[in-house]
């Protein structure tokens, strides 16, 4: 009887573990009315970035899924569908057409189309579908929302992200997608100078259609961003966001007492080097962050016929590493008047941003795991700016240095001014309303100033102490394009012909000062000698 009870308990435990274990979900997605497979359907674990697309036969395989997860199926022109994962990990999903989505206008390259007429792999994300919360950089609005688009970031406040569409994998060339904002291709994928609150929609071009429109620049896909425009109704909106950040978990390392014990057992000759403090270096280099954002926007018509939107953003973002910070001030303007019964339309967009950020060396987290927990953060008698440092006969060693001192004494800042804008004019010919002539001109200009400073009291492994350096860079991107677009329906046949010309120029320059300190002012009293200092983690084998 006892053996039977134990066996029953074992079966129940096994069932429980299986229920919560991650599984692989397989299935097929079909069109409900015809039963035909649907290729390119986005399959996403809701609330995560774990997603795939169906293949040409409508099949998909999605790993790391557990019971209770919700799978979100999305396809242009079809109603979204959610499926809750239970015990069945082999799915047969039917999607039905949505007349509302079929008529939705999406931006593709130099023009627009409806979902039902789109032929390439295009995915459109509007404001209602974007990621919510305290979003600092624009690309995070679509993080986890588009299958095949992978966005990773370093975690530093305001840091740029690495964006990959369908896993670009060139060894030598860039794998970054092309970013187009209101018709203007911009340089790089750094979007931290854009106010996320200004963005109205994203269109992601994933296949050869991107190359057909933008040439080799679109080889890694294209992300088209459309910003919010003015309207006839007057409105004034204010949005305030505050966010609190904390890193709850810590790496389990020896505290001061355990460290003294292990040194006494393994390195008794080094006992005299230990201190009397009990310092948790992880707590010292990590901080609880408070971040705030202010967004003010005004909409309405100027002079009764120019729909206008003006927005201002102020962001102060703290990082969770000591000294890490990101500040941004942003102003954007959009004007969209029309004339001659909407035959002539003008769209003007302009964005201006000031960014000031201080970088914190993330490597000091590793230093916090290795540094001696028996030593204090500060030492009033220390010649190194009042911070404790390991010395032997007055000499700083080549081992790990005080991570708090490294963060506070080394100040690396970056100040950037960026402005970009675009003017587009569309004219629908009166004598041939099926044809529209368009011309646009835009620019993207960036000026960056980076500085590095550390005092003479910073320990060094060379005979050069301290740092005072500066680097500047400037870039200018200019773009002009003109198109003629003819659209007409002949019965069931729709004709859409586009011809155009595009001109783009890039200019960049930069300079760096190197260390500007006078070599004769360098102190050499504390030159280093090679000594290895080790902080043993608890996983160190006994």
Regions found by a protein language model. Name each.
Residues 1-339, 344-351, 420-421:
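Short, small/polar-rich motifs associated with maturation and membrane association
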Residues 412-441:
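Charge-patterned, long linear interaction tracts outside catalytic cores
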Residues 253-282, 373-406, 479, 483-485, ...:
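Flexible glycine-rich, low-complexity coil/linker segments exposed to the extracellular/periplasmic environment
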Residues 247-249, 279-281, 289-313, 317-324, ...:
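Flexible loop and strand-edge segments within Gram-negative outer membrane beta-barrel domains
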Residues 104-105, 117-118, 359, 449-452, ...:
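Short, solvent-exposed loop/turn and secondary-structure capping segments
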């Amino acid at each position: 009887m006892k053996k039977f009870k134990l066996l029953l308990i074992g079966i129940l435990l096994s069932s429980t573990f299986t229920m919560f274990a991650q599984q692989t979900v397989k299935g097929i997605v079909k069109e409900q009315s015809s039963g035909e497979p649907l290729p390119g359907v986005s399959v996403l674990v809701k609330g995560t970035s774990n997603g795939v697309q169906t293949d040409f036969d409508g099949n998909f395989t999605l790993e790391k899924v557990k019971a209770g997860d919700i799978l979100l199926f999305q396809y242009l022109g079809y109603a979204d569908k959610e499926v809750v994962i239970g015990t069945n990990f082999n799915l047969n999903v039917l999607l039905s057409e949505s007349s509302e989505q079929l008529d939705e206008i999406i931006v593709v390259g130099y023009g627009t189309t409806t979902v039902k007429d789109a032929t390439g792999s295009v995915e459109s994300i509007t404001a209602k579908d974007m990621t919510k919360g305290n979003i600092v950089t624009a690309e995070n609005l679509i993080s986890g929302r588009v299958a095949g688009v992978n966005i990773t970031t370093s975690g530093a406040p305001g840091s740029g992200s690495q964006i990959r569409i369908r896993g670009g994998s060139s060894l030598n060339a860039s794998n970054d997608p092309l970013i187009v904002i209101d018709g203007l291709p911009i340089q790089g994928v750094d979007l931290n100078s854009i106010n996320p609150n200004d963005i109205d929609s994203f269109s992601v071009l994933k296949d050869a259609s991107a190359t057909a429109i933008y040439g080799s620049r679109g080889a890694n896909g294209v992300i088209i961003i459309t910003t919010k425009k003015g309207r006839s109704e007057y409105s004034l909106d204010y949005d305030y966001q505050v966010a609190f950040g904390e890193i709850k978990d810590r790496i389990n390392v020896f505290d001061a007492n355990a460290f003294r014990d292990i040194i006494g057992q393994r390195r008794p000759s080094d006992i005299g080097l230990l201190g009397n403090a009990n310092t948790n270096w992880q707590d010292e280099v990590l901080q609880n962050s408070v971040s705030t954002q202010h967004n003010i926007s005004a909409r309405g018509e100027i002079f009764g016929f120019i729909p206008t939107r003006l927005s201002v953003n102020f962001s102060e973002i703290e990082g969770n590493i000591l000294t890490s910070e990101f500040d941004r001030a942003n102003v954007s303007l959009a004007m969209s008047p029309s004339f001659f019964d909407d035959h002539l339309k003008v769209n003007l967009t302009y964005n201006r941003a000031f960014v000031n950020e201080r970088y914190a060396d993330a490597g000091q987290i590793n230093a916090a795991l290795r540094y001696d927990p028996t030593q204090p953060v500060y030492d009033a008698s220390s010649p190194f700016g009042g911070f404790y440092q390991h010395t032997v006969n007055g000499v700083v060693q080549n081992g790990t240095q005080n991570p708090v001192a490294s963060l506070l004494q080394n100040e690396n800042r970056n100040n950037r001014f960026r402005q970009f804008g675009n003017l587009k004019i569309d004219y629908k010919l009166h004598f041939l309303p099926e044809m529209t002539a368009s011309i646009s001109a835009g620019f993207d200009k960036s000026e960056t100033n980076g500085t590095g400073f550390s005092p003479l009291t910073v320990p060094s492994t060379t005979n050069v102490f301290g740092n005072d350096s500066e680097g500047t860079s400037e870039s200018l991107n200019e773009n002009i394009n003109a198109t003629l677009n003819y659209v007409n329906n002949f019965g069931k046949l729709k004709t859409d012909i586009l011809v155009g010309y595009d001109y783009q120029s890039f200019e960049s320059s930069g300079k760096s000062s190197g260390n500007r300190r006078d070599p004769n002012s360098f102190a050499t009293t504390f030159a280093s000698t090679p000594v290895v200092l080790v902080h043993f983690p608890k996983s160190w084998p006994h």
